[in-house]
Amino acid sequence: MTLLALGINHKTAPVSLRERVTFSPDTLDQALDSLLAQPMVQGGVVLSTCNRTELYLSVEEQDNLQEALIRWLCDYHNLNEDDLRNSLYWHQDNDAVSHLMRVASGLDSLVLGEPQILGQVKKAFADSQKGHLNASALERMFQKSFSVAKRVRTETDIGASAVSVAFAACTLARQIFESLSTVTVLLVGAGETIELVARHLREHKVQKMIIANRTRERAQALTDEVGAEVISLSDIDARLQDADIIISSTASPLPIIGKGMVERALKSRRNQPMLLVDIAVPRDVEPEVGKLANAYLYSVDDLQSIISHNLAQRQAAAVEAETIVEQEASEFMAWLRAQGASETIREYRSQSEQIRDELTTKALSALQQGGDAQAILQDLAWKLTNRLIHAPTKSLQQAARDGDDERLNILRDSLGLE
């Protein structure tokens, strides 16, 4: 039995290829059934995200194993084998275990240390358990990877610092305001970055959010999710005074929030401070706003310095995390090898017990027929000894004939010979 991890990710393949190799939730069961129908596959898990598609497999070794699995993947997705082969990575046994542990811990992610991947790996594993796993070693590998990811989170700072613009903006707000639960936040825009910001703010107990967008329809789904109020961009001037924090990210070619608008808002707020985080390019907030007293303006470049600093911290933490992964993968493989030895020991014990039972039954039968007890016991002892040492004796003789001193010493050691 061999453990494999093979696939493509954001480092090896462009999005144009990654999108062709994805497995949709609707077809995942069918794909797993097809995968397990391959004669060499004992069990499988399919991990498919926007940044990676990977197969984790327990397989029987055979000739052309790699070719057979690549062919299955290409046939399933109607791909040219050369296109896939140039982007595919292939990990076996210890390397496969290490790879899964790194993936689950966020060490192989586009954003180093991002936590979402662990949930995606857990879902892939859960989906595979619906009648598709069929391999205890593979199941144990995933369970171990989950505990390793938790250990990495607990024992290192891999997830402690913001490394996305959205998260950095929220981190900045939390550094400036003692509690976000009492502030009002105005979000300008309704794109992906603002969506992430809104979710981060909701996680940090922000109670009052206003979302301003050019079209109310696009903002409505987000407001339903986070419980915000929707206004149009034209309403910003009137509502700016209500906001303690303004975070803006639109595609507007011209500034949306000008110096005069902020001056009026500050006057209405009796100069209560305002934090403005402009993460748009081109900028949504006129740079002159930063010169106003009690208006604290941060641009995307300011956030980038925070992100760069935090990324360096994560990279330092990643070194610690890699050490944990290396140690845990080594321990897992030792456990797996021990399972193989346990099976051999069970087979050897069963074989020995079968010989014992066979000869004992014959001896008891002879005694019941009135045979000489001493002679029967001596015969039992002689036959039992010969049957039990027959296979080791042949192995010792063969090692001696082959001149294989290393094997001979291993056999001597296993038989307890001085």
UniProtKB/Swiss-Prot annotation:
CDD domains: NAD_bind_Glutamyl_tRNA_reduct. It catalyses: (S)-4-amino-5-oxopentanoate + tRNA(Glu) + NADP(+) = L-glutamyl-tRNA(Glu) + NADPH + H(+). Pathway: Porphyrin-containing compound metabolism; protoporphyrin-IX biosynthesis; 5-aminolevulinate from L-glutamyl-tRNA(Glu): step 1/2. It comes from the Bacteria. GO terms for biological process: protoporphyrinogen IX biosynthetic process from glutamate. NADP(+) binds at residues 189-194. Its EC number is 1.2.1.70. It holds the Pfam family GlutR_dimer. The record marks 99 as: Important for activity. One of its GO terms (molecular function) is glutamyl-tRNA reductase activity. Keywords: NADP, Oxidoreductase, Porphyrin biosynthesis. The active site is at 50 (nucleophile). SUPFAM superfamilies: Glutamyl tRNA-reductase catalytic, N-terminal domain, Glutamyl tRNA-reductase dimerization domain, NAD(P)-binding Rossmann-fold domains. The keyword Chaperone does not apply. HAMAP family: Glu_tRNA_reductase. During catalysis, the active site Cys acts as a nucleophile attacking the alpha-carbonyl group of tRNA-bound glutamate with the formation of a thioester intermediate between enzyme and glutamate, and the concomitant release of tRNA(Glu). The thioester intermediate is finally reduced by direct hydride transfer from NADPH, to form the product GSA. Belongs to the glutamyl-tRNA reductase family. NCBIfam families: hemA. Homodimer. Catalyzes the NADPH-dependent reduction of glutamyl-tRNA(Glu) to glutamate 1-semialdehyde (GSA). Possesses an unusual extended V-shaped dimeric structure with each monomer consisting of three distinct domains arranged along a curved 'spinal' alpha-helix. The N-terminal catalytic domain specifically recognizes the glutamate moiety of the substrate. The second domain is the NADPH-binding domain, and the third C-terminal domain is responsible for dimerization. This is Glutamyl-tRNA reductase. It comes from Salmonella dublin (strain CT_02021853). The gene is hemA.
